Amino acid sequence: MNRSFHKSQTLRFYDCSAVEVKSKFGAEFRRFSLDRHKPGKFEDFYKLVVHTHHISNSDVTIGYADVHGDLLPINNDDNFCKAVSSANPLLRVFIQKREEAERGSLGAGSLCRRRRALGALRDEGPRRRAHLDIGLPRDFRPVSSIIDVDLVPETHRRVRLHRHGCEKPLGFYIRDGASVRVTPHGLEKVPGIFISRMVPGGLAESTGLLAVNDEVLEVNGIEVAGKTLDQVTDMMIANSHNLIVTVKPANQRNNVVRGGRALGSSGPPSDGTAGFVGPPAPRVLQNFHPDEAESDEDNDVVIEGTLEPARPPQTPGAPAGSLSRVNGAGLAQRLQRDLALDGGLQRLLSSLRADPRHSLALPPGGVEEHGPAVTL
């Protein structure tokens, strides 16, 4: 049996008031004891440690391993007494040079990281990437946040900008323009306020939540509809310390997705007007495939009505249902041609709003009261 081990066991069993200390500096180990009930002051303990290891001329830091395996510092009388009282039964002390300790080696789980590093040195396999020690943030503060996600519509976004008394400006410019609204009477152009430019390095650009051509709808809960550009500017300046802006993003792909349904992109408007997303048109474009226009199982165009429409005269040799295929193929070509041109979405809506009796060659009186049901 080792003599030092036998001596330490004797010290533990016969002197309960003594705490055995095992200090480590580099590859050197030293053992000594302290009085559990009267450990003394930290300055005396520091002098004892540096004298024991003969490092009086070095600037070192002292840490200890607690019962959970974390390496905690000893730098005042309070945590020194805590370290001595928590020793069960051995107090393990680690001594480091101050430049090594400032790299962030102290803290929770530091001993586990140190053991993994030693194991990696013994491993003969492929060398892993070196672990990067990230220190604690010195100036950590929020810059922006998205609020009221459950209250605003899916196509809108409510952003809070935090300035925290800094001199950095908000970092965006606004302009007036025309926005397109979908009303029961059709599409109408109304005045609107838009973000025209972002200042590089500003607060708004650093958030990543605002972009050019985003339409401003509210400023701190006040709607901007009916207000001039100067009035909206004054509202933003007055609330610049805690600005809450409700916008309609020009790019809907980066918006919050709810219920497993992705939002399409309206794209930045080319003529200075706000883009809009119509519910029926994107659904038709997503579900339509050119191969379905030539299917023999289902009719491409289905007309539902209470009256039986008069069947137009067929040419000799034409099979039954050829008119529906021709009309369906013509409609598919029109959809592809309109999508290839600029502003294809608006042309598609205008073509779908046209009277279907002209495009489908239906006789008058062959449609029910609420109009035909066209299914692609």
Curated annotation (Swiss-Prot):
Main location: cytoplasm
Compartment annotation: Cytoplasm; Cell membrane; Cell junction, Tight junction
Span list, region Interaction with PARD3 and CDC42: 127-254
A GO-annotated cellular component: bicellular tight junction
Domain named PB1: residues: 18-98
Any Pfam family the entry gives: PB1
Disordered as annotated region, ranges: 356-376
Record function comment: Adapter protein involved in asymmetrical cell division and cell polarization processes. May play a role in the formation of epithelial tight junctions. The PARD6-PARD3 complex links GTP-bound Rho small GTPases to atypical protein kinase C proteins.
SUPFAM superfamilies named among the record's database cross-references: CAD & PB1 domains, PDZ domain-like
Quaternary state and interactors: Interacts with PARD3. Interacts with GTP-bound forms of CDC42, RHOQ/TC10 and RAC1. Interacts with the N-terminal part of PRKCI and PRKCZ.
UniProt cross-references to CDD domains, sorted A to Z: PB1_Par6, PDZ_Par6-like
PANTHER family named among the record's database cross-references: PAR-6-RELATED, PARTITIONING DEFECTIVE 6 HOMOLOG GAMMA
Pseudo-CRIB domain span: 134-151
Record's keyword terms, sorted: Cell cycle, Cell division, Cell junction, Cell membrane, Cytoplasm, Membrane, Tight junction
Organism, as annotated: Homo sapiens
Segments of skewed composition (Basic and acidic residues): 367-376
Superkingdom of this protein's organism: Eukaryota
Protein's UniProt name: Partitioning defective 6 homolog gamma
Domain comment quoted from the record: The pseudo-CRIB domain together with the PDZ domain is required for the interaction with Rho small GTPases.
